[in-house]
């Protein structure tokens, strides 16, 4: 960060899940990581093993998903996010543009990615999808790569990246359509908070696809889940000696925990915010930052 202050720091961070757990101390590692990510990155795509598993089970009907299958989903999403950098398109967006459009408050830069159409590794889709189908699938909770239900929160901002040959007019109509039908799920104090980019070149094996990036307050569910697991272990100081033995301090854990809980309450605060109260919020925010 010191060396390259003007670079956009972008991470794809895998959030642990109890369903597919390699190590017992995942909640510790995740919490300590979030503590760093909140301060040091510009955009973080939260990819959740739990959600990836659910997608493999439910949507792709895989009975025993391997890491290969999970990675297939992750790579589809990552490729979608960086499409605009790599290919020519009508409406191009780079990472900086994404960051500018997606992050209304510097700490709240944890996005849930989604992808449509979801295909398993072997079977590429045989039928061409229409733009309405893509849009509908893209906003579907089952397609989110983070195990949170967007219906439990509100979108601060959304970016959609469509790939393939399609009519721009249709894309715009569909995106407006989604916003009008579900207006309660988009915060009203950020107008036009859905950005669309279209790129001509679809991913291999598909005619068209869409990548979804949502900055939703529902992502707090994910942090709450980790926080609960963290607290359960930290209360009893379980496994702490592995960390303290490496020269870490218990204080760091406490700080990381409270930082993550602050993040959750910040998301909640903006979820409940309405346009009228906006003035009050600005003052509170400034006070908070000075205190921090």
UniProtKB/Swiss-Prot annotation:
UniProt xrefs under SUPFAM superfamilies: Tubulin C-terminal domain-like, Tubulin nucleotide-binding domain-like
Gene Ontology molecular functions: GTP binding; GTPase activity; structural constituent of cytoskeleton
Cofactors named for this entry: Mg(2+)
Positions with biased composition (Acidic residues): 274-292
Pfam families the record matches: Tubulin, Tubulin_C
Chain residues that bind GTP: 49, 71
Domain of life: Eukaryota
Localization terms from the record: Cytoplasm, Cytoskeleton
Function summary: Tubulin is the major constituent of microtubules, a cylinder consisting of laterally associated linear protofilaments composed of alpha- and beta-tubulin heterodimers. Microtubules grow by the addition of GTP-tubulin dimers to the microtubule end, where a stabilizing cap forms. Below the cap, tubulin dimers are in GDP-bound state, owing to GTPase activity of alpha-tubulin.
Entry's family note: Belongs to the tubulin family.
Record's protein name: Tubulin beta chain
Organism: Strongylocentrotus purpuratus
């Amino acid at each position: 960060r010191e060396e390259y202050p003007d670079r956009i720091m972008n991470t794809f961070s895998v959030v642990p899940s109890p369903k597919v757990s390699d190590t017992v101390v995942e909640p510790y590692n995740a919490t300590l990581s979030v503590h760093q990510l909140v301060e040091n990155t510009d955009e973080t795509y939260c990819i959740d093993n739990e959600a990836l598993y659910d997608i493999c089970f439910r949507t792709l009907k895989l009975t025993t998903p391997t890491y290969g299958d999970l990675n297939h989903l992750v790579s589809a999403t990552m490729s979608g996010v960086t499409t605009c950098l790599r290919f020519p398109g009508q409406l191009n967006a780079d990472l900086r543009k994404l960051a500018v459009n997606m992050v209304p408050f510097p700490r709240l830069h944890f996005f849930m990615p989604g992808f449509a159409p979801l295909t398993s590794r072997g079977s590429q889709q045989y039928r061409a999808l229409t733009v309405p189908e893509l849009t509908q699938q893209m906003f579907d909770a089952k397609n989110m790569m983070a195990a949170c239900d967007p219906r439990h929160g509100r979108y601060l901002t959304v970016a959609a990246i469509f790939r393939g040959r399609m009519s721009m007019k249709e894309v715009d109509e569909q995106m407006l359509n989604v916003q009008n039908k579900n207006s309660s799920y988009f915060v009203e104090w950020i107008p036009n908070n859905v950005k669309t980019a279209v790129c001509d070149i679809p991913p291999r094996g598909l005619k068209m696809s869409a990548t979804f990036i949502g900055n939703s307050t529902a992502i707090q569910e994910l942090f709450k889940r980790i926080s609960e697991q963290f607290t359960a272990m930290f209360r009893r100081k379980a496994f702490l000696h592995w960390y303290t033995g490496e020269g870490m301090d218990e204080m760091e854990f406490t700080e990381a925990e409270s930082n993550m809980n602050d993040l959750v309450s910040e998301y909640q605060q903006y979820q409940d915010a309405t346009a009228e109260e906006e003035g009050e919020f600005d003052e509170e925010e400034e006070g908070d930052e000075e205190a921090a």
